[in-house]
Amino acid sequence: MSRRNPCKYEIRGHCLNGKKCHFSHNYFEWPPHALLVRQNFMLNKILKSMDRSNDTLSEISGAAELDRTEEYALGVIGVLESYLGSVNNITKQSACVAMSKLLGEINSDDIKGLRNKELPTSPKIRIYNTVISYIDSNKRNPKQTIHLLKRLPADVLKKTIKNTIDIHNEINVNNPSDIGVNEQNE
């Protein structure tokens, strides 16, 4: 039995070099050390792919304490505006987590009220419907919503964040908080 070196280019049972590969693909010929290295490599790949899709708030995926301290210092809107303006080195991950929290704060009934005031041909109706769908998705599964937001291209994500902030501000102008109403009455 010939002792060729184990293939370094094999991933999930397929060699990236194709038929011209001169390394061994027979696992029974591989020394135990090479099998352990391959097993560790495969487990790390599985862990990374699972972490990205399921657990968006873990340390591995990047939403650890750093993002939470940014949010604590700047607030949810501050993090999103910093991401839009490309200041304070806000990552896409922290912007998506902050966006999810903002979507949780907005009431979809308020947006439906704004949408119903618009003309049927208004381009704002599509924006309102998009934000409403993100709010509904966020209520069902916030982690999946964060994952969906992270998969958006940067320019589309920035446009979505800007539209959501505009709608949030529009709702706050139309429906002032109870504290503001009490101050106006006095």
Swiss-Prot record:
Residues 76-169 are annotated as: Globular core. One of its GO terms (biological process) is regulation of viral transcription. GO terms for cellular component: host cell cytoplasm; host cell nucleus; virion component. The record marks K8, F23, K92, R151 as: Involved in RNA-binding. It is found in: Virion; Host cytoplasm; Host nucleus. Phosphorylated by host in infected cells. Phosphorylation is not essential for zinc binding activity and oligomerization, but zinc binding activity is necessary for the phosphorylation and oligomerization. Phosphorylation up-regulates viral RNA synthesis, replication, and pathogenesis in vivo. The modification Phosphoserine is found at S58, S61. Essential for viral replication in vivo. Plays a role in the association of the matrix protein with the nucleocapsid, which initiates assembly and budding. This is Protein M2-1. It comes from Ovine respiratory syncytial virus (strain WSU 83-1578). The lineage of its organism: Viruses, Riboviria, Orthornavirae, Negarnaviricota, Haploviricotina.
